[in-house]
Each structure stands twice: as C-alpha cells, then as structure tokens.
Amino acid sequence: MKQKILITGGSGFIGSAITKHLVKDKCRVIVFDNNSRGKSRRLKEIKNKIKFIKGDIRNKKKLLSIKGKVDTVIHLAYVNGTKFFYKKPYEILDIAVNGLLNVLDLCRKKKVKNFYLASSSEVYQNPFKIPTDEEEMLKIPDVHNPRYSYGGGKIISELYGIHFGKKFLKKFIIFRPHNVYGKDMGNEHVIPEFINRFKKLRNKEKFLIYGTGKEVRSFIHIDDFVHGFDRIFKKGKNQEIYNIGTNEKITISKLAKLIAKVLGKNIKFKKTKVLKGSPSIRCPDIKKIKKLGFKHNISLKNGIKKILN
C-alpha cells in the first residue's frame, strides 16, 4: 500500500501542485491548510481523492486531531509574498517557529518516518558565490528589517528540523525553491504582478519597476519544480539540502520586456527605489539536484505563454 502523506499548506500554489502529483502517484494524501493564502479550488479536481482538513498549524489541538497513521510529512505551510514580509513579520515568525514545533510534535507522537521541509532562496542573502550552492553561509543582514522575517523564519525551521530529524526521523530533507512561477500563483509575485499591470497599462503610460531593473533572478516553472521535488522525494538522501530552480539568469527589466513582447506591447520604464533588503542577484547552483535526475524543460518565454493560455 502506498504511504500516507500529510501536506501542510497543501492548497497553496506549490502545495497544491505537489498534492496533485502525489495523488497521481497513488499516494494517500491529507492536506492541512487554513486557506489564508491557499485556495480550495486548486484541489477541486482531486477533492474526492484526498482528505482536506481546514486548520492553522499554530492550533496544536486541531493539528493533533488528525486520525490514524502518517508515514511522511511535507511541510509547506507559511506566509509567502514579498509584501507580507514587510507587513506581517511577527505572524511570519510565529508560523515559522510555533507552527513548525506543533508539526514536529505531531511527527513525534505519530512516529512519522520521513519529513520534507520547504525552505526558500530567501535564506541566501548577499551570497559569496553565484550560482549559489547549498553550502553557502546563511545569514540575516539586519534583524530590524522586517523583510528578513521570512528568510530568518526559514533558517530557524531548518535548524529545528535538522536536529529533530537526527533524533526522531528516518529521513529528513530540506528543499529550497527558487522563484517558482505558474498559473494561479497569486498576484503578490513579480511575474503575475507584471502581467496584470501590463494588461491595465494605458497608451504611453510608463511601466513602473521597483529598483534599477538590473536586479537578477532565475525563475522555474511550477511543472519543472514538481519534477525536481519528485526527484528529491524519491531519490533524496537523509539530512541533505537541495536547491530547486534553474541557473538561467535574467534581469528584472529584461523580464518586463519579455512579458511585454509576449503580450504584444511596447513599453517605456519608470524606475523607483528598490525595497530595502531586496537582493541584487539570486541564482541557484543546481548540480546537486541534477545528480538525482532533475532536468528543467520549460523556458521562461514558454512558461509565460502557458500562464497566458
């Protein structure tokens, strides 16, 4: 019989994609999500094939009410979206710490064997190496800047998870997503935000870019991301950390031009000051996950077309 898997944050953008993939793989899945950022409609096509529990991971009683055996936990529940880093730093840290501790307590009580922790590229701040591998030093440049609540919470989660895993789990793995994009991801992220703003742009109106436009990112389509997660889920090694992304770099201004071209628009830019704490460049080293058989197939241009179609 296929293993029973609990996915926290399973109705979110990434969580729902992983949930659908595991259901297709004949796994028995429980989704635990309060739908504050997630959406039940993302799971509509498989709702009769999963068990959905609406709840907040900070509600320990609700979390521990999950019945029966759980073999594996995939922990994704968090608050994502850059604007929330600045607006809700306390809530982000509360979920990162108290929410995770509740999930780990459930693992201990149910004797869960395997745990996959979703971390983030936000743990890499001002990295020494580009592309950045998993051995890069993790740091918080400014504890007063609310932006780092997200990356700081992820670093705390990694520390808790690693040492809990050594004591209680058969397998503990961290995966660090890098700028995942795709249809229905929410408008708080750069690609859907740009698409929506382009559609509303009036003739001769300048397109606003935060920062210089020279900031560099590497994007991975959700379908390629799920393939990467699948490689980690099936072949990843205990106590290892894996980047999931591509090392194809693009500046934010070139990204805007690419989206405009796909939409058939001509644009002129208006640039403004960069948000404090926003990294100038982010690009993962993916040699480690490639050794598990990972290969990304969707170009950024084709990925944007998939969103629009």
Task: Name the predicted role of every residue range.
Residues 1-180:
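N-terminal Rossmann-like NAD(P)+-binding domain of SDR-like oxidoreductases, especially those catalyzing
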Residues 14, 62, 92, 153, ...:
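Hydrophobic alpha-helical packing elements
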Residues 18-21, 55-58, 200-309:
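C-terminal substrate-binding subdomain of Rossmann-fold SDR/epimerase-dehydratase oxidoreductases
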Residues 85, 138-147, 170-183, 195-220, ...:
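A conserved pocket-lining segment of Rossmann-fold NAD(P)-dependent short-chain dehydrogenase/reductase
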Residues 107, 165, 198, 232-233:
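Hydrophobic pocket-lining residues that define ligand/cofactor binding sites across diverse proteins
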Residues 126-128, 183-189, 288:
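Short beta-loop-alpha junction of Rossmann-like oxidoreductase domains
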Residues 156, 160, 164, 193-194, ...:
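Hydrophobic alpha-helix immediately C-terminal to the catalytic Tyr-X-X-X-Lys motif of short-chain
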